[in-house]
From Swiss-Prot:
Its main location: plastid. GO terms for biological process: CDP-diacylglycerol biosynthetic process; phosphatidylglycerol biosynthetic process. Esterifies the acyl-group from acyl-acyl carrier proteins (acyl-ACPs) to the sn-1 position of glycerol-3-phosphate. The physiological acyl donors in chloroplasts are acyl-ACPs, but acyl-CoAs are used as artificial donor for in vitro reactions. The enzyme from chilling-resistant plants discriminates against non-fluid palmitic acid and selects oleic acid whereas the enzyme from sensitive plants accepts both fatty acids. Squash is chilling-sensitive. Does not seem to discriminate between the acyl-ACP thioesters 18:1-ACP, 18:0-ACP and 16:0-ACP. Pfam families: Acyltransferase, GPAT_N. One of its GO terms (cellular component) is chloroplast stroma. This is Glycerol-3-phosphate acyltransferase ATS12, chloroplastic. Pathway: Phospholipid metabolism; CDP-diacylglycerol biosynthesis; CDP-diacylglycerol from sn-glycerol 3-phosphate: step 1/3. Its EC number is 2.3.1.15, 2.3.1.n5. The gene is ATS1;2. One of its GO terms (molecular function) is glycerol-3-phosphate O-acyltransferase activity. Gene3D superfamilies: Glycerol-3-phosphate (1)-acyltransferase, Glycerol-3-phosphate acyltransferase, alpha helical bundle, N-terminal.
Length: 462
């Protein structure tokens, strides 16, 4: 999903729970300064949202300190806004010349031959070439599985463009800023991502829960309010899937959501073109913070910059931010194979709440559930190396949002600040889990619209 400005030169008083906040934000993957992944990647190697409305990982920040630094001088908001506009929107205005051989491909045989020739010419590292071929084979099989009579045409069209974009990035690596705005010209990366993922969704077995609440969210954004979607996270394709399920009814949300993304989706060559088409707040994953000890401090500083960018955006109002406070993508229970939302980190939830509170703009946290794991399931375990195997399938997907949960009402029933924080996080998670179970009954249980409950009204608005 994802824009800015502010004034006030003093930091809003902190909530009574603590003077400084250790912020744990759960995200997916992204790339900033050289990371362990990017170092191993340049020779190879998604957790993405659109431009005008992954993957999950964890960050640690001092929210109060970052906010204080952010507002130290009266010119900071204006200068930072200018800098954000200059650095986060169009880092590649004019594309450099590069090999366009993939765009001339007219058959599967030519496509595979082109990968081989570009590798032999030294333009593609062998591991990237192997990843390209595997991606093509898996994508082709999934689209053919859909039964679309134009499957072959769709596969060739989408894959030639995807491989062209991957090769471009290998030749001229794209560098993400801490706040990245989706690139829409001269090449529209957002539409590219939408077109690529669309054939993988079985819309006949896909559902949106509580559609009217998405309209309420848009109205709040129009009023200048901020909205944070507290969500579970299932695949690298989550941003595109969310956008595709809402593009007919809520195009503003579909294109403008800002996704908090971890460094790995910004470092993997097979994933970067899709990330370029999404609005992102880029962070380094806590899970990979110490992969290369000498880079740890650089990563922490980059994360602090990202936090400041987010604070600036929120102070301007009308921001829609998606975040997964679980620390990673959902994974199936190893003993049963059943999928459930991964538990939320209470610190991550609390610090998003505090950022909203400190913005001096009305803000709302909505619990959002997403079910789409079969389309692009993650590896069974968290991997250190960049370049995971991408399993792809044609399947149904589900998205549901529930009413926002009042922090004040929960705080009124607890005396201990830590209990309040845990209870609020649990209330959000329980709502996500409840909605997820309804989507699961509708999609996996084949109950369709009949799975609707008093709390989740399902529809198919396409």
């Amino acid at each position: 999903m994802f824009i800015l400005s502010s004034s006030s030169s003093t930091l809003p008083s902190a909530p009574p729970f603590s003077s400084t906040t250790s912020i744990f934000l759960s995200f997916s993957r992204v790339s900033l300064p050289p990371s362990s992944s990017s170092l191993k990647l340049l020779p190879l190697s998604l957790q993405f949202g659109p431009p005008k409305l992954a993957s999950s990982c964890s960050l640690r920040f001092s929210a109060s300190r970052a906010m204080a630094e952010l507002i130290q001088d009266k010119e900071s908001a204006q200068s930072a806004a200018t800098a954000a506009a200059a650095s986060s929107g169009y880092e590649r205005r004019n594309e450099p010349a590069h090999s366009r051989k993939f765009l001339d491909v007219r058959s599967e045989e030519e496509l595979l031959s082109c990968i081989k020739k570009e590798t032999e010419a030294g333009k593609l590292p062998p591991n990237v070439a192997a990843g390209m071929e595997e991606l093509y084979q898996n994508y082709r099989n999934a689209v053919i599985e859909s039964g679309n009579p134009k499957a072959d045409e769709i596969v060739l069209s989408n894959m030639t463009v995807a491989l062209d974009r991957i090769l471009l990035d290998v030749e001229d690596p794209f560098v993400f800023s801490s706040h990245h705005k989706a690139i829409r010209e001269p090449f529209d990366y957002y539409i590219f991502g939408q077109n690529y993922i669309r054939p993988l969704i079985d819309f006949g077995n896909s559902f949106v829960g509580n559609l009217s609440l998405f309209k309420d969210i848009e109205e709040k954004l129009q009023q200048g309010h901020n909205v944070v979607l507290i969500s579970n996270h299932q695949t690298e394709a989550d941003p595109a899937i969310i956008s595709l399920l809402l593009e007919k009814t809520n195009p503003y949300i579909a294109e403008n959501t800002i996704f908090v993304a971890g460094d790995r989706v910004l470092a993997d060559p097979l994933c970067k073109p899709f990330s370029i088409g999404r609005n992102l707040i880029c962070v380094y994953s806590k899970k990979h913070m110490f992969d290369i000890p000498e880079l740890t401090e650089t990563k922490r500083k980059a994360n602090t910059r990202s936090l400041k960018e987010m604070a600036l955006l929120l102070r301007g109002g009308s921001q829609l931010i998606w975040i997964a406070p679980s620390g990673g993508r959902d994974r199936p229970d190893p003993s049963t194979g059943e999928w459930y939302p991964a538990p939320f980190d209470a610190s991550s939830v609390d610090n998003m709440r505090r950022l909203i509170q400190h913005s001096d703009v009305p803000g709302h946290l909505f619990p959002l559930a997403l079910l789409c794991h079969d389309i692009m399931p993650p590896p069974s375990q968290v991997e250190i190396e960049i370049g995971e195997k991408r399993v792809i399938a044609f399947n149904g997907a589900g998205l549901s949002v529930a009413p926002e949960i009042s922090f004040e009402e929960i705080a009124a029933t607890h005396k201990n600040p830590e209990e309040v924080r845990e209870a609020y996080s649990k209330a959000l998670f329980d709502s996500v889990a409840m909605q997820y179970n309804v989507l699961k009954t509708a999609i996996s249980g084949k109950q369709g619209l009949g799975a609707s409950t008093a709390d989740v009204s399902l529809s198919q608005p396409w």
